[in-house]
A protein has these predicted regions:
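Structural recognition of the beta-strand scaffold that forms the well-ordered cores
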Residues: 14-15, 33-35, 79-83, 108-110, ...
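Solvent-exposed loop/turn segments at secondary-structure junctions
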Residues: 18-22, 38-41, 85-90, 114-118, ...
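Extracytoplasmic substrate-binding proteins
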Residues: 97-182, 274-323
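Alpha-helical, coiled-coil/dimerization segments enriched in small aliphatic residues
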Residues: 185-220
Length: 323
């Protein structure tokens, strides 16, 4: 998208995906005006940060209005932290729509970095902290960015100290339930997108690495069925789309149906009760802290059961600027 100019630090802004909403919130930018879908935004993690409040009722769910251009005029944001290619590929905007909103309302600033598998994305990708650094420039929040980097590096250091040797790490398969209920969209850890960051950081062996099963992407929603799942036979199964579920809700919705299925019940992960919620698709730095800690305790309970991988109070201080 080239250079983007801002008249000042945005006071009113919107994201579409929770990754950018979480980045801006972490940098002291406040709440997003809108979000793609409330159910996919893990705002419950903010409840664990002392003194931090997030009012979901003040956030417009953009998909309810079909992500129509009129919503952007109503929000009247100073900045839109959205990759405009998402609007043209997912929501039938054309370039004139993008240009009109940019001119009439405010600039677009974003890059779709959830995954790296879409053919239309033929420009540079950023990892989570590269994108966060650019967002910190927008909000003039270098001090907050540096503090988040320190926390992140401390977490990774703790992980490295506690991880079991490579040959003691399980093979894992990451999936998203398809509409049929008996099929899944596959996701590969080596895709490089920020949505799979925690699995790479935790050194998991991708069960798909030795197969020809591809990574989910726009325009190719190939699935794996339960028989294929049994053939791959992962030791750990990570299931998305249940980020906000309680443990009992997840077991009722996912684990029990797998146990009751003749094919799925033979999968090693199902037999070993190693089927876990994979959290949300999108994550900024705060959500990633929680995702990583939960994944570590789920997958490596002996190594991480007593571990607190990040300081909640420190995160709250960074958000408020009181550090």
């Amino acid at each position: 998208m080239g250079e983007v100019e801002f008249e000042g630090v945005p006071e009113r802004w919107t994201a579409l995906l929770p990754s950018y909403a979480d980045m801006a919130f972490a940098l002291g930018g406040g709440q997003t005006l809108g979000i793609q879908n409330h159910a996919r935004f893990g705002t419950e993690v903010y409840d664990e940060l002392p003194g931090i409040e997030f009012d979901e009722d003040e956030v417009t769910e953009l998909t309810e209005g079909g992500v129509d251009t009129e919503l952007f005029y109503e929000m009247d944001a100073d900045a839109h932290f959205i990759d405009p290619h998402i609007l043209t590929h997912w929501y039938d905007w054309d370039r004139d729509d993008v240009d009109q909103v940019r001119t009439d309302v405010g600039p677009f600033f974003g890059n779709f970095i959830r995954r790296h598998s879409d053919e239309w994305h033929d420009y540079r990708y950023y990892d989570l902290y590269e994108a966060l650094e650019l967002m910190a420039e927008v909000f003039q929040a270098r001090d907050r960015y540096d503090a988040l980097v320190d926390l992140h590096e401390t977490m990774l250091g703790t992980i490295d100290e506690r991880l079991p040797p490579d040959d003691q790490r399980p093979t894992a398969m990451l999936v998203y339930p398809a509409e049929s209920g008996n099929e899944f969209y596959p996701f590969r850890f080596d895709d490089g997108g920020i949505s799979t960051k925690q699995w790479r950081d935790l050194g998991l062996t991708d069960a798909l690495a030795t197969t020809d099963v591809g990574h989910y992407r726009y325009g190719d929603r190939s699935t794996v069925d339960l028989e294929t799942l049994l053939e791959i036979d992962p030791e750990v199964l990570l299931v998305r789309n249940h980020g906000g579920d309680s443990e009992s809700e997840f077991r009722e919705a996912v684990v029990e149906p797998l146990r009751d299925d003749p094919a799925a019940s033979k999968v090693q992960a199902v037999k070993d009760d190693a089927v876990y919620s994979a959290g949300y698709l999108d994550q900024g730095p705060i959500i990633n802290f929680y995702h990583t800690e939960r994944a570590a305790t789920d997958i490596y309970p002996d190594a991480f059961d007593d571990a607190t991988l990040f300081d909640r109070e420190r995160v709250a201080e960074i958000v408020t600027g009181e550090f």
